[in-house]
């Protein structure tokens, strides 16, 4: 091999290492990589395969490094807080509760929409946050409460404007086969996770158009990665993701930026309490047909309920990555369209997009939690 070829090979390896490292960091951190960076990695690989000249190789490496540095620096360009007003739904607990506190500490004017204005979550916000934070009664499935919240927000902000709306309110269900989930649970999930978000968005968009602000919708990795036993929840998050993607294109002409957050597994109250699990189990069993009873059995449902503590144990109790990404989506001059906070969340999304279906199904089946066997499929000894 000639010295020239050797030098070109080492340069290609160095560039591949830089770009590959960038992609890996994006997978580990959950931050979406700009599409240009992904394309850049592919183009670089193609250029290396074409055995370009040493001069051209050096030029492309310089351009690649410049673009990566430029994209990285532009992500860090944050707008001043200036007491910007932000509405957060689902602030009773979990992401919404933590975000309301976090934004209040940063100096934002926060409107915390809660399901129960007299509940412990709302009381804690009133107790520990500044006077800039207002707690609003806001069940996103009740149009009259959304309308009332809109009136109160408009009255308080007056000419200052509303900078951002964070649609975070959401519900989960007992993890179980889609065949066993009653239609009432499907409807409830859709009412809160999708229609609630759409209704809040439609109500507050006139204010966001005036401020040329931000619409941040909290979806889920489950809306992209097909996880078993989550059909009702995942379907609503998939619908929310598509709604957010399309409305992002539509609102671009108004200067409103729309961002979708797709968290991985975090420990929040969305899975509910023991009482809620028991009620869901009873509701599922009450809708059992004779065929379902014979093929699945009641113990199958009970075993599925026992999986929930395992899910919580495997979830990350530190929601800081989610809060950090939402803050960035609100404050960055050029936010990403998607954020994937969580352990290897972006990697799972990539697997769902590019992995062969049979292999993806196998990985999901083996990689999350043990599946009980329905009564009719159990081996009789």
UniProtKB/Swiss-Prot annotation:
Q: Where are the transmembrane segments?
A: 4-24
Which sites bind substrate? 220
* Binding, NAD(+): 83-112
Question: Topology versus the membrane, per the UniProt entry?
Answer: Single-pass type II membrane protein
Q: Which UniProt keywords apply?
A: Endoplasmic reticulum, Lipid biosynthesis, Lipid metabolism, Membrane, NAD, Oxidoreductase, Signal-anchor, Steroid biosynthesis, Transmembrane, Transmembrane helix
Q: Which family does it belong to?
A: Belongs to the short-chain dehydrogenases/reductases (SDR) family.
The protein here is known as: Estradiol 17-beta-dehydrogenase 2
Q: Which organism is it from?
A: Mus musculus (Mouse)
